[in-house]
Amino acid sequence: MFSSLYPLARASLFKMDAEDAHHLTLRALGAAGRTGLACALSARVPDAPRTVMGLTFRNPVGLAAGLDKDGAAIDGLAALGFGFIEVGTVTPRPQPGNPRPRMFRLPQAEALINRMGFNNHGVDQFVKNVQAARYRGILGLNIGKNADTPIERAAEDYLYCLERVYPFASYVTINISSPNTKNLRQLQGAGELDALLAALKDKQQRLADLHGKLVPLALKIAPDLDDEQVKEIGDTLLRHKIEAVIATNTTLSRAAVQGLPHADEAGGLSGRPVFDASNEVIRKLHAEVGNDVPIIGVGGIFSGEDARAKLAAGAALVQLYTGFIYRGPALVSECVKAIARERTA
């Protein structure tokens, strides 16, 4: 039902400020989930199970982190047919993020620019929201560091968040690739990443012993990486036996949107312009890690064929964000069906 109405809703939403529209949509989805009206949103998406990270996904098309930073609309989002939901990024303490305006549409390029800055209500409220959700599918919880935590102490924030979210997560994503937190991408450097992942894997094992279950870790990386950086990241993922990698986050490049309104705004660019760069990182990363570290492909998926291209590049699963905002829930079903056809062809 919601899929057929979305084009009308989008016309109204796109007349609003981008962030106001975002919050309005989340509030509506959250209310639908809390009141049981989510069943009215339910999309008819076929099952297409895949097992990745030791988890069985209802279908391989997920929601990327960033849409629901506080986990406040999990049930409403789950009704739209996603095979898995990822919420966050959450930080140890609440923080407002960067000053508004901080989200911009580039409709001519089917893109967004955001410099949100990990705005969220903190991990304690996040955990309460996750616990209140009725959704029992695969749920990824995405964690980051507070803006005022020195980069040299970033590991402390990740370790704290990991401990808090661990009992409630199907998997936990380590976000070190947002361009909107100062110096965060430094953690993708070989030495910094090695130290961070060593600490996280040690914590993961101790939490697994405590809770009697091993919750997989996924690392989210940027598209703005050269060949040597991709190789170093691949080597580090293999060495620490990280369970998955999400490729990719938003880009700082503006090559594909030069001259468009808002193109010069600071922040990360997402949507169609990042599609090729994301696929290139996926291909190069897959050449390094093979099937030992499953890749979750995200960036610029606007059609079923786009989703298939991500898998052809080496991804095991895909996630939607900007394409979902532009095309709505119909994109989820289209991607699942396209991938299912590929497997049966």
Curated annotation (Swiss-Prot):
Chain's gene name: pyrD
Cited PANTHER family: DIHYDROOROTATE DEHYDROGENASE (QUINONE), MITOCHONDRIAL, DIHYDROOROTATE DEHYDROGENASE (QUINONE), MITOCHONDRIAL-RELATED
GO biological process: 'de novo' pyrimidine nucleobase biosynthetic process; 'de novo' UMP biosynthetic process
Location (main, coarse): membrane
Catalytic reaction list: (S)-dihydroorotate + a quinone = orotate + a quinol
SUPFAM superfamilies: FMN-linked oxidoreductases
NCBIfam families, sorted: PRK05286.1-1 (NF003644), PRK05286.1-2 (NF003645), PRK05286.1-4 (NF003646), PRK05286.2-5 (NF003652), pyrD_sub2 (TIGR01036)
Lineage: Bacteria, Pseudomonadati, Pseudomonadota, Betaproteobacteria, Burkholderiales
Record's subcellular location: Cell membrane
Active site feature: 178 (nucleophile)
Taxonomy, superkingdom: Bacteria
Molecular function as annotated in GO: dihydroorotate dehydrogenase (quinone) activity
Enzyme nomenclature, EC number: 1.3.5.2
Cofactor(s) recorded in Swiss-Prot or TrEMBL: FMN
The protein's role, per its UniProt record: Catalyzes the conversion of dihydroorotate to orotate with quinone as electron acceptor.
Record's keyword annotation contains Metal-binding: no
Protein name: Dihydroorotate dehydrogenase (quinone)
Residues bound to FMN: 65-69, 89, 142, 175, 220, 248, 271, 300, 321-322
Gene Ontology cellular component terms for the protein in this record: cytoplasm; plasma membrane
Keywords carried by this UniProt record: Cell membrane, Flavoprotein, FMN, Membrane, Oxidoreductase, Pyrimidine biosynthesis
Self-association state and partner proteins as the record states: Monomer.
Cofactor binding, per record: Binds 1 FMN per subunit.
Pathway assigned to this chain's UniProt record: Pyrimidine metabolism; UMP biosynthesis via de novo pathway; orotate from (S)-dihydroorotate (quinone route): step 1/1
Positions with a binding annotation for substrate: 69, 114-118, 175, 180, 249-250
Membrane topology: Peripheral membrane protein
Xref: InterPro entries: Aldolase_TIM (IPR013785), DHO_dehydrogenase (IPR050074), Dihydroorotate_DH_1_2 (IPR012135), Dihydroorotate_DH_2 (IPR005719), Dihydroorotate_DH_cat (IPR005720), Dihydroorotate_DH_CS (IPR001295)
